[in-house]
Amino acid sequence: EILRCLVGSEMCIRDRVYVVKGQLSWGHCLKIFDASEEHELGTVKEQIFSWWPQFELYEGSDCIGTLKKEPWGWFKPRYNIDFNGWHIEGDWTEWDYTITGPDGEKVAAISKELLHWTDTYVLDIADPEDALYVLMFVLAIDAEKCSRN
């Protein structure tokens, strides 16, 4: 399943649309809604009191996972995901990432498209049930990259 994703706008997955809204706060706080914008599906919150960038992912009030930037990724970004045994690997350009499951199976491939006015990512997600979670991690990575620039 392919998701063409305009970060900061609408995210379309087949017949589903996610709307992302940022909140004014210390650190990034991104809320994900369904297309009607009536039902909040998830939240990505930056933890500001940590040595290295760290984001917590929430469904309702429950923290379901974290993404941490590892400090010593000299030639390519290194992130640590604490969610369902997932692992993420990125390339040195910080445009392409692969998320794998605990047995090494591909959960998602993420690639950034160039020549767009906004950050645009294409997400190839193996299981549609993981779409929201993959989107949350992509938003966290994009927010971390924005904080550096």
Report the location of each language-model feature:
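Single conserved hydrophobic/aromatic residue that forms the stacking wall/gate
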Residues: 1-7, 13
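Short loop/turn microsegments at loop-to-beta-strand junctions
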Residues: 8, 28, 94-95
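Beta-strand-rich structural segments
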Residues: 8-10, 32, 99
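Generic N-terminal leader/processing signal
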Residues: 11-12, 19, 43-45, 104
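A positional/architectural concept
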Residues: 14-26, 30
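Long terminal segments
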Residues: 24, 36-39, 45-46, 51-149
